[in-house]
Amino acid sequence: MILGIGTDLANIERIERTLDRFGDRFRNRVFTEIEQRKAERRSDTAGTYAKRWAAKEACSKALGTGLRMGISWKDMAVSNLRSGQPVMQVTGWAAERLREMTPEGYEAIIHVTLTDDHPWAQAFVVIEARPLAEVGEVNLTYPAPPRM
């Protein structure tokens, strides 16, 4: 069952100008240490940050709150599986909101996809609720833990 859908389009050049103007103040306010390390290792640093910015915006929309109700930028974090697939983790108020949205007997799965075509970065987030596996049953579709 689909619990929420969100999308966002970010301008890479705008993110680059923001990084140039505000530097660490912006990075530390919006991105986790893991997200910052990943972006700083990439040749397209601004594009990497822009995709993660868009993912956080899209996730906040899928949660049905936007960036309000106590949800902060760092409550949502994008990392990647070994395959490169992006995954979203939520903590704090975002995790609380996700728990509130998820029906009893279900688990929430956050699907995220990222793309860019300069000067645009886009993210799309779908929050799905799946029935919990019965005792002895294995849910083979649940994503592997993210690579840190």
From Swiss-Prot:
Domain of life: Bacteria
The keyword Transferase is assigned to this record: yes
Cofactor: Mg(2+)
GO biological process terms on file: fatty acid biosynthetic process
EC id: 2.7.8.7
Subcellular location: Cytoplasm
GO cellular component, one term: cytoplasm
Keywords: Cytoplasm, Fatty acid biosynthesis, Fatty acid metabolism, Lipid biosynthesis, Lipid metabolism, Magnesium, Metal-binding, Transferase
Catalytic reaction list: apo-[ACP] + CoA = holo-[ACP] + adenosine 3',5'-bisphosphate + H(+)
A GO term for molecular function: magnesium ion binding
Binding site for Mg(2+): D8, E57
Family statement drawn from the similarity comment of this UniProt entry: Belongs to the P-Pant transferase superfamily. AcpS family.
Function: Transfers the 4'-phosphopantetheine moiety from coenzyme A to a Ser of acyl-carrier-protein.
Protein name: Holo-[acyl-carrier-protein] synthase
